[in-house]
């Protein structure tokens, strides 16, 4: 049978316990004293340098686009500045070139670099299907491409799959939204059309790009940037 033995606290143990409690009480007093000392130290007055506005970056031209077409596009960017929120990049559709040529130019206005893609024009702009745009039209039902500055707007899914709405900013294309002139992918804008037929197919006025190119086109264009379409 185990006998429980109770031991009375020794004098040495009591002294150790009292010392520990006294030390714990000293810590808050030391912290308070340190805080009071810090509060009494005068801090130097802070004089922040005035914030300068970010310098305006002059857009750099692309060597791929004709100088006159580039000048027109930059002028349109300035003219519609309040509507176009993003001005680091823009897209130029050079409809003087054949549809067999990469003529949809994505231009970085900071670096001056560019990436070019194939893009179809409207059947009403090229009735004979020559591969060259003959005329523009803003008329509903014309199935023609229209010229001028467009604002890249929101995305939606329609009969051509994922598409991006465009808002026409000029009198020559201000029916673009009601005509459903959009950016979308299409089989007739794939590169194999050029190998087979020597030119792309035609849209109903939309900027139709290759199906495999669509994701990159959306990524580079984004929302709030400008497309400028012209023939010079």
Give residue ranges: language-model regions.
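Gly/Ser/Thr-rich helix-start
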Residues: 24, 149, 206
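N-terminal targeting pre-sequences for secretion and organelle import
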Residues: 204-232
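Signal peptide processing junction and immediate N-terminal pro/mature segment
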Residues: 30-42
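N-terminal secretory signal peptides and thylakoid transit peptides that target proteins
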Residues: 2-22
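NTP/phosphate- and nucleic-acid-binding module
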Residues: 10, 25-27, 45-46
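Cysteine-nucleophile amide-bond enzymes
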Residues: 21-24, 28, 61
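Cell wall/extracellular polymer interaction/catalysis modules
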Residues: 40-203, 212-215, 219
